[in-house]
Amino acid sequence: KNKTLYQAVTRWFSANMENAETELHYDSPFHLLIAVILSAQCTDKRVNMYTPAIFERFPQPSDLASASFEEVYQMIKSISFPNNKAKHLVGMAQMLVKDFGSEVPGTLEELVKLPGVGRKTANVIQSVVFNKAAMAVDTHVFRVSHRIGLVTKSCTTPLAVEKYLMKH
């Protein structure tokens, strides 16, 4: 039963969303990382309203790494959880400069070391930037996967849903 459902869902997405892409606007892996961090608990549409100014002010990790919390906060204060996100963005950029030669790392293990980057964000970066098979499980994927029976009731966390979907 599940295999048939997986095949039907896969067929539908192949036919209707062959090139599914993020709706976040970005022009580099670094800028996508900023946008995905900002998108937590916020709509992509809202994030896209603020990222052009952010990307112009912080074209490289070193620019953001040397910014003050207050400057970043002022630029993102209308996005959800600006205090945490401002701290995470500056810390993320500092770690990129210090530990990764100002490059966005390509592995899940490295990505989740960055402040503000959890599995979902890391999986988006893996998929979009590095074209790797990755499953970014947000609240919508979690809910719909349960609702249509793609996962079992024992999948009670986003990680469990991610692992189950990737396995099948």
Model segments located where?
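Catalytic cores of DNA base-excision repair glycosylases
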Residues: 1-168
